[in-house]
Amino acid sequence: MSFSRNQVLKGLKTKKAKPKKNPTVDELFEIAIDLEESGDRWRLEPAKCLRFYQKSLETYDRYLLQCPNDFDARFNKARLLLNMATNCDMLYKDSQVCLQKSIEMHKHALLLQEAPDIWFNLAQVHLNLAEIWVDLDREDLAYPEIQQALQSISHSIDLQERERIEWENTIQTSSQQKYEEIPDIQARRLYFIEADKEASTLVTEIASLACSCKLLEESDFEKLCQIMLPITEKLDILKLMDWYLAKTKRLVLGGKENEVAWIDLLQVFDHQLSQLPQLNLQNPLDPNSSVKPLHIQLLCDKADAYIDFAETLLDSCVSTEESASIEIMTRAWNMLGVAAKSLKMANTYNPNHVRILISRADLEIQRAAIPIMVAQNSKLVLYKNAKVLYEKAFRDYSTKKTTRTFAEIVLKHYQLQKLTNPETIKMLDSLTEVAQEDILNTI
């Protein structure tokens, strides 16, 4: 998820005025900001969010025609393109176009001025592109983006630290009288602390993805471990789990760690869940309801971790003797069963969470594909469960037909029918060939 930074923008309005037919240059800038903020407020409605963002983009373009060297406008447009890709649930093809344009706009802005925030956002753009390429099974294209993301966030951290040191020196060298004149000392100090946490979180996300890449050389892996060492002291365990899991998986597969280390790490999720207060789902005024999102996130993260472990076990069966292979596949089946229970519990906390419904359906199909007796005996039930889950997701998302998620639901439901009842296949809704191809590339 994007958490791109905003700068303090010139001329930001506190009171909205009715737009004029022929706005001045400064008014164009303010209108673009208003439209962008309106899009932000409609993030839960991707189509409406996209319409506001597109109008904002057009307005920034009109402004930049008259003020091509305005850093704030270029910064805003670069960020807006990033947010379009991350907030509007577009097809990967369209997201990639937005992200590539965002890179170009970031580079134009950097020619005008270097700032930590723009390097930070640029790192996010490269990371988002890398994640799309990984999903498309193109690690050869993902890895250069990961490298660019690491370079960009390193620039951001260096500039941020330089700013912090200069600011601290200003305070220390000021006399008592001048010291009192320095505005918002505490607020500025908190800003640097928060910026450091954000940067550490982003580095962790990039390092986790890098660690899962086969193209990562051993020397680069060791450098990543050194980079992450101080970060592990700044962030809590939940924000570090992706890194720990990716690192441990690499060490286990490389024969440098015992499998037990990976299994022990999976237990962290249960420990963290046990620390959270219990929720009363029957009581809408439950005082513990504020921790519900954390429950859901932990359960989904736990499911992802168990699925990854199971998939690694299944991959290892290719070069294993038949008797041992059956034992390994049975372990994978059990792991996927744990993941299924976690997702079901997460769905209990939020029955209409479409991504959880899709993940549950995907998992049922994955379990049915394991060539062992228990899976084959359960196949029809698992397929039926998946069909029901896709159809519920479709009903909950039927008004969002322009999104990638909608296309994913429709096509996965269609593909499932090919496995269960190929004689009477019917699509839930029509899809363009472009949308079908976009989804098929990731199934």
From Swiss-Prot:
Keywords attached to this entry: Cytoplasm, Nucleus
GO cellular component: cytosol; nucleus
Primary location group: cytoplasm
The organism's place on the tree of life at top rank: Eukaryota
Keyword Cytoplasm set for record: yes
Protein's UniProt keywords contain Cytoplasm: yes
Cellular localization per UniProt: Cytoplasm; Nucleus
InterPro entries recorded: TPR-like_helical_dom_sf
Family assignment from sequence similarity: Belongs to the UPF0656 family.
Full protein name: UPF0656 protein C926.02
Organism taxonomic ancestry: Eukaryota, Fungi, Dikarya, Ascomycota, Taphrinomycotina
